[in-house]
Amino acid sequence: MRTLLAVALLVAGLQAGQATQSTKGSSTTKITALIYAPEIEPSLKFWVDQLGFTKVVEVPEGNKLGFVILVKDGAELMIQSTAGVKKDISAMVEYARPAACLYIEVGDFDDLVKRLGTAPVVVPIRTTFYGMKEIGVREPGGNIVLFAAKVQQSATH
């Protein structure tokens, strides 16, 4: 059963790679994750100081940050504070709570694990049947982040 699922995932991935152009509607040019946090500053320590992202945009909200854009190696992440959402799009306030789960593939799994420091682990290190080594943590904003590397790219753990 696991082999069948792994083959299905592989085929789906190959098909997704082949389907680069849509024939209906406008084209999709980019997808960027937007996560919410009660306060952005604690999340910056995790994403910037520990994981090496760079803050390229910041929007203040009073004496704190209301919104930031972080980048690293072509990946982009937006973080918006609850206060920022309330001011910017008040209809979204009830949804602006930590509820995201991000899945991020990395090149050096062991280095990543070291960089996580004391982040609360919610999924202990595991090797999956689909060939990934993973660890899941809760980032300071309350969102879940699963980090993964292809087994052949990670050292034995």
Feature locations, PLM:
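Conserved active-site tyrosine of GNAT-family acetyltransferases
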Residues: 43, 47-48, 116, 139-142
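Mature N-terminal segment immediately following signal peptide/propeptide cleavage
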Residues: 32-45
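Vicinal oxygen chelate
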Residues: 18-34, 54-105, 111-138, 149-157
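Sec-dependent signal peptide recognition
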Residues: 1-7
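Hydrophobic h-region of N-terminal signal peptides that target proteins for export
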Residues: 8-17
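Helix N-cap motif at beta-to-alpha junctions
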Residues: 39-40, 107-109
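Short glycine-/small-residue motifs
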Residues: 144-147
